[in-house]
């Protein structure tokens, strides 16, 4: 659980929001700080992309799917695991979905 703007926000044991409807961009900043990440425009691009992906497909993308979808939308420069790991060193799929307020990707350990 975390406290945000005087409210209790329920999370699972790994810090993923239990209710993605409670997510907001200011809350994302707090979640990112807890992950040791200062959100840059490049981070936001991925976070928003992951949220859009979830809204369209009703699932959080695992790393392989994330890389492929990012490459399709933004090109090879951003759609590769090296770029994504520079932004999210503990795992792009795991950290980006957590910061985006989404469930942990199914295929993430």
Curated annotation (Swiss-Prot):
Cellular component GO terms held in the UniProt record: cytoplasm
GO biological process, one term: tRNA wobble position uridine thiolation
Database matches in InterPro entries: DsrC-like_C (IPR042072), DsrC-like_dom_sf (IPR025526), DsrC-like_N (IPR043163), DsrC/TusE (IPR007453)
Gene Ontology MF, one: transferase activity
Pfam families assigned to the protein according to its UniProt record, in alphabetical order: DsrC (PF04358)
Principal location listed in the UniProt entry: cytoplasm
Localization per record: Cytoplasm
UniProt keyword terms in alphabetical order: Cytoplasm, Transferase, tRNA processing
EC nos: 2.8.1.-
Active site: 108 (cysteine persulfide intermediate)
Function comment: Part of a sulfur-relay system required for 2-thiolation of 5-methylaminomethyl-2-thiouridine (mnm(5)s(2)U) at tRNA wobble positions. Could accept sulfur from TusD.
Assembly behavior: Interacts with the TusBCD complex. Interacts with MnmA.
Family: Belongs to the DsrC/TusE family.
NCBIfam families: dsrC_tusE_dsvC, PRK11508.1
Name the UniProt record assigns to this protein: Sulfurtransferase TusE
Species for this entry: Escherichia coli O6:H1 (strain CFT073 / ATCC 700928 / UPEC)
């Amino acid at each position: 659980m975390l406290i945000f703007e005087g409210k209790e926000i329920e999370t699972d044991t790994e810090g993923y929001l239990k209710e993605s409807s409670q997510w907001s961009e200011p809350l994302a900043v707090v979640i990112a700080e807890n992950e040791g990440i200062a959100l840059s425009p490049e981070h936001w691009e991925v976070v928003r992309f992951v949220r859009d992906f979830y809204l369209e497909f009703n699932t959080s993308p695992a790393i392989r799917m994330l890389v492929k979808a990012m490459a399709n939308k933004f090109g090879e420069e951003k759609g590769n695991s090296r770029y994504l790991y520079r932004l999210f060193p503990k795992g792009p799929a795991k950290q980006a979905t957590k910061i985006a307020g989404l469930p942990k990707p199914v295929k993430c350990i």
